[in-house]
């Protein structure tokens, strides 16, 4: 299955194909001339897949190097980026060469940021290996790293030259890592894709059912995201819909300590919290919060988090990228399959943090 992200200045394809990881070289040779490439990955993915991808790239004529770092959200920072830069200099990567991001969301965001800033930008591609990355973070060109103040506070908008998705790699994910990816999938069903929501409703919620439906789930999610990205690449309008649950979710990730609560888990908690308060305020229809809770719990996603520190969460979300002066853009779901943006005073977010 193939989808096109038809941006006027930088169109690219998303290829979703079982077993495609071993064909990475032939895929990349359709995008780039044989050249020097660096695979950026983490130590866990490196053990599983780096050699397979490296051999495939070398067979296609690419001079290939591998850089890996310690897995996890705690590594997604400028210190790790500096280590990437050091490695790129060491192997002599030039502006005509490229970077292959092989891994989950942390790898994709960090490798993309390094690619977009090294020598003012080199080409890169995404080969996502986690469900979260396959359905969300590998598409759309958002790159970045965390700071002590906020998640993804430093970053760029830089589109990849292509995205290669092999659903079979999901079989090597741990159960928690697989399940957390469903946080983003549930979000897509809520904000845009009623057909996806119906498919999720028919599933039994087990990890086995996620793997069985993986291709369809990935396709629907990528299709929603690529349409929104084409309409609003730089996150000024409808692309904000993709942030449903993320305002509070990112605050949870930052205050808990990066990596303690996984991204998809934080999104699920954020969607439930914002919906619960919005429903009380009459901004979302009665009963929708229970629907969200039921769907999240069916797939094993958390819907609450302790300790819930309202003051710390509020302080974290004041650094949110959707904040504009003393207001913030909050995404809500007025009905299943659609989203809306509400600009509210930043101070009012305190109400959305109350239990």
Swiss-Prot record:
Superkingdom of origin: Bacteria
Keyword Signal: no
BP-aspect Gene Ontology terms: amino acid biosynthetic process; aromatic amino acid family biosynthetic process; chorismate biosynthetic process
Pathway: Metabolic intermediate biosynthesis; chorismate biosynthesis; chorismate from D-erythrose 4-phosphate and phosphoenolpyruvate: step 2/7
EC number: 4.2.3.4
Leading EC class: lyase
Binding annotation for Zn(2+): 184, 246, 263
Coiled-coil region: none
CDD domains: DHQS
GO cellular component: cytoplasm
UniProt remark on cofactor binding: Binds 1 divalent metal cation per subunit. Can use either Co(2+) or Zn(2+).
Compartment annotation: Cytoplasm
Keywords assigned: Amino-acid biosynthesis, Aromatic amino acid biosynthesis, Cobalt, Cytoplasm, Lyase, Metal-binding, NAD, Nucleotide-binding, Zinc
This protein's record includes keyword Transmembrane: no
InterPro entries: Dehydroquinate_synthase, DHQ_synth_AroB, DHQ_synth_fam, DHQS/DOIS_N, DHQS_C
Main location: cytoplasm
Cofactor: Co(2+); Zn(2+); NAD(+)
Protein family membership: Belongs to the sugar phosphate cyclases superfamily. Dehydroquinate synthase family.
Function: Catalyzes the conversion of 3-deoxy-D-arabino-heptulosonate 7-phosphate (DAHP) to dehydroquinate (DHQ).
Protein known as: 3-dehydroquinate synthase
Name of the gene this protein is made from: aroB
């Amino acid at each position: 299955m193939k989808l096109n992200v038809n941006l006027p200045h930088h169109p690219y394809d998303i290829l979703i194909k079982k077993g495609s990881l071993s064909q990475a070289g032939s895929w990349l040779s359709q995008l780039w001339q044989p050249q020097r490439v660096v695979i950026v990955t983490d130590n866990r993915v490196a053990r599983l897949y780096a050699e397979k991808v490296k051999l495939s790239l070398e067979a296609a004529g690419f001079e290939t190097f591998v850089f890996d770092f310690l897995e996890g959200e705690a590594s997604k920072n400028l210190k790790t980026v500096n280590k990437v830069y050091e490695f790129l200099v060491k192997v002599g990567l030039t502006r005509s060469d490229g970077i292959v991001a092989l891994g989950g969301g942390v790898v994709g965001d960090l490798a993309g940021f390094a690619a977009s800033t090294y020598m003012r930008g080199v080409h890169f591609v995404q080969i996502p290996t986690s469900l979260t990355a396959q359905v969300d973070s590998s598409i759309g060109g958002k790159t970045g790293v965390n700071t002590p103040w906020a998640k993804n506070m430093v970053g760029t908008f830089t589109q990849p030259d292509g995205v290669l998705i092999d659903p079979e790699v999901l079989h090597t994910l741990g159960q928690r890592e697989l399940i957390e990816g469903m946080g983003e999938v549930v979000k897509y069903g809520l904000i845009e894709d009623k057909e996806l929501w119906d498919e999720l409703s028919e599933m039994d919620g087990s990890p086995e059912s996620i793997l069985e439906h993986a291709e369809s789930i990935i396709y629907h999610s990528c299709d929603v995201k690529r349409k929104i990205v084409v309409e609003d690449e730089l996150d000024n309008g409808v692309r904000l819909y993709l942030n449903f649950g993320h305002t509070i979710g990112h605050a949870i990730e930052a205050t808990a300590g990066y990596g303690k609560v996984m991204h998809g888990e934080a999104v699920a908690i954020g969607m439930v919290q914002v919906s619960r308060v919005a429903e009380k305020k009459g901004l979302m229809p009665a009963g929708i919060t229970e629907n969200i809770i039921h769907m999240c719990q069916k797939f094993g996603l958390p819907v609450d988090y302790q300790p819930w520190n309202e003051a710390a969460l509020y302080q974290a979300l004041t650094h949110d990228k959707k904040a504009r002066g003393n207001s913030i853009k909050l995404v809500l779901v007025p009905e299943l399959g659609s989203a809306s943006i509400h600009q509210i005073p930043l101070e009012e977010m305190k109400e959305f943090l109350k239990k």
